[in-house]
C-alpha cells in the first residue's frame, strides 16, 4: 500500500484552485520515492514540502532552470533559513531534477550544478559506559508490565543501536532468542539482522512473560497501554522518563544509537561492521563516530597519562 502517493494533502500549494503541471510532477516524483525507492513516509513528506515551496515560487515546469532555482534559494537566504534547511532543499530539488530529466519531463538536469551549502555536523551526545548502564536500568514506569516493557526497549535500543522506527516495527517473529539476533527493517525497506547481548535477552524474556496481559496483538513485539503497536512518540517518552531518573539532560532515543556506535568502536569494532549494524548506506555517515571515539580517546589520554 502506498504511504504517500499523489493523494496526500497538497499543503504546499497556494493560490490556484488546481495544481500546476509542476505540482503534479512533484506528486509523481513522491509516488516514485514511495513505490520504487521505498523511502519512508516522513522522508517523502520532507521532499514534498521542499518541492512545493519551490513550485510556489517557480510556478511552472517551463520556468524550472538553474537561474530560477538559484533565485528561489536566494529568497530562502534572505528569509534567514539555516544552512541545514538550504542544504536539504538543494538536495530535494537536485533529486527531483534528476528524476524529471531521466523521465523526459526536462530536456536537461537543470539542478545538477546547484551547489549545496556546507554544514558543520555537531558531534552527537554520547553517554559514558557507566552512564549508559545506569540509564538502561532506570525505566521509570511504576506499573509492572510497563516497567518490564520499558526496560526491554531501553536495553534493545542501546544493545543494537537501531532507530526508533525500526524498534517500533519489530514483530515477535523477528526475534531469534537462541542466537540472540533481531531482524530489522530499516530505511528503504532494507532488511538486516542485528545481534544483542545477554542483558537485552533477559529484559526481552521478562517482557514476554507479561506482554499478553497488555495486548491481544498477535504480531507486535512492543505495545502501548491500549494494546496497539507502540509508536515513536511513546518510545521518546520512555527515554525521557529514564533520562530524568538518571539525571541526564537532553537525551533522545537517537542518542542511544550514537552511544551504541561509539562504544562499539571504543571496544575495537571495525568501522565497516558498525556501518552494517547501524544500517548506514554510506560509510561517511558512520565515520562521524570515529571522530567521537577519537575525541574520547584523547580526553582519556590527557586525563590519565603522566606525560600528557
Swiss-Prot record:
Gene Ontology BP annotations: cell division; chromosome segregation; DNA transposition
Core-binding (CB) domain sequence ranges: 20-101
Pfam families the UniProt entry points to: Phage_int_SAM_1 (PF02899), Phage_integrase (PF00589)
GO CC terms of this entry: cytoplasm
Locations listed in the record: Cytoplasm
Record carries keyword DNA-binding: yes
Record-annotated Tyr recombinase domain positions: 122-302
PANTHER family attached to this UniProt entry: PHAGE INTEGRASE-RELATED, TYROSINE RECOMBINASE XERC
Protein name: Tyrosine recombinase XerC
Amino acid at each position: 500500500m502506498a504511504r504517500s502517493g499523489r493523494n496526500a494533502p497538497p499543503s504546499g500549494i497556494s493560490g490556484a484552485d488546481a495544481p500546476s503541471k509542476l505540482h503534479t510532477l512533484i506528486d509523481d516524483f513522491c509516488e516514485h520515492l514511495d513505490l520504487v525507492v521505498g523511502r519512508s513516509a516522513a522522508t517523502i513528506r520532507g521532499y514534498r514540502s521542499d518541492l512545493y515551496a519551490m513550485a510556489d515560487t517557480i510556478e511552472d515546469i517551463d520556468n524550472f532552470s538553474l537561474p530560477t532555482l538559484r533565485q528561489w534559494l536566494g529568497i530562502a537566504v534572505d528569509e534567514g533559513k539555516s544552512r541545514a534547511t538550504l542544504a536539504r532543499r538543494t538536495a530535494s530539488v537536485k533529486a527531483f531534477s534528476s528524476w524529471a530529466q531521466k523521465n523526459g519531463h526536462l530536456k536537461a538536469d537543470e539542478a545538477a550544478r546547484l551547489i549545496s551549502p556546507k554544514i558543520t555536523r555537531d558531534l552527537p551526545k554520547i553517554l559514558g559506559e557507566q552512564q549508559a548502564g545506569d540509564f538502561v536500568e532506570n525505566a521509570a514506569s511504576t506499573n509492572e508490565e510497563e516497567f518490564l516493557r520499558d526496560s526491554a526497549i531501553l536495553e534493545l535500543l542501546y544493545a543494537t543501536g537501531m532507530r526508533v522506527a525500526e524498534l517500533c516495527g519489530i514483530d515477535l517473529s523477528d526475534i531469534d532468542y537462541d542466537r540472540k539476533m533481531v531482524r530489522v527493517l530499516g530505511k528503504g525497506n532494507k532488511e538486516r539482522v542485528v545481534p544483542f547481548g545477554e542483558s537485552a535477552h533477559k529484559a526481552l524474556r521478562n517482557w514476554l512473560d507479561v506482554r499478553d496481559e497488555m495486548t491481544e496483538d498477535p504480531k507486535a513485539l512492543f505495545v502501548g497501554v491500549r494494546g496497539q503497536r507502540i509508536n515513536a512518540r511513546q518510545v521518546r517518552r520512555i527515554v525521557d522518563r529514564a533520562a530524568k531518573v538518571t539525571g541526564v539532560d537532553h537525551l533522545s532515543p537517537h542518542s542511544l544509537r550514537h552511544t551504541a556506535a561509539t562504544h562499539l568502536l571504543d571496544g575495537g569494532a571495525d568501522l565497516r561492521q558498525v556501518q552494517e549494524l547501524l544500517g548506514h548506506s554510506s560509510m561517511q555517515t558512520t565515520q562521524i563516530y570515529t571522530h567521537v571515539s577519537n575525541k574520547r580517546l584523547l580526553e582519556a589520554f590527557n586525563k590519565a597519562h603522566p606525560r600528557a
